[in-house]
């Protein structure tokens, strides 16, 4: 398991999210520019493997096309509360297809939930913010609602969580 966790002194949560998104786009763009032979090989390999799958199970875009999409588009941002509402009302949750059903606020998101948000609902990288304070670390800045903290996770298609971070608590009291 590999992940990036940006924590920058004097940055607020939005600045940390912007930094994470810019960093990921820089890395992907670097690979597109400097590793085209490798990416073409992987793209062809993926297409060969997916040709064995039923049409509805195949990716809508090839690997290189997906990477370009990441670089050229903004990541979708939503709060944990909004993500829970999307998941709670989703077909997989309503039809009990999720292994871990979403009942409401406080649910710890699992890989199946993250993949649904990224791959089915929004079809783009997703940033979830403002998690419940009881499922995150003590050092994260508590929001004014006293229920959530200034935390974020960046979710990528196929990969899942690739960046996690927060605004650190800086207030003495």
What name fits each language-model region?
Residues 1-10, 151-157:
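Residues forming anionic-ligand binding surfaces in small-molecule and nucleic-acid pockets
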Residues 7-19:
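Catalytic palm subdomain of template-directed nucleic-acid polymerases
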Residues 11, 131, 167:
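An acidic- and aromatic-residue-enriched active-site/binding cleft used to recognize and process polar
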Residues 14, 136-139, 163-164:
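Short helix/loop capping segments that flank catalytic or ligand/cofactor-binding pockets
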Residues 16-20, 79, 171:
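Hydrophobic (often cysteine-bearing) scaffold residues that line and stabilize catalytic clefts
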Residues 22-155:
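Metal-assisted phosphate- and nucleotidyl-transfer catalytic regions
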Residues 158-173:
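Extended C-terminal subregions enriched in glycine
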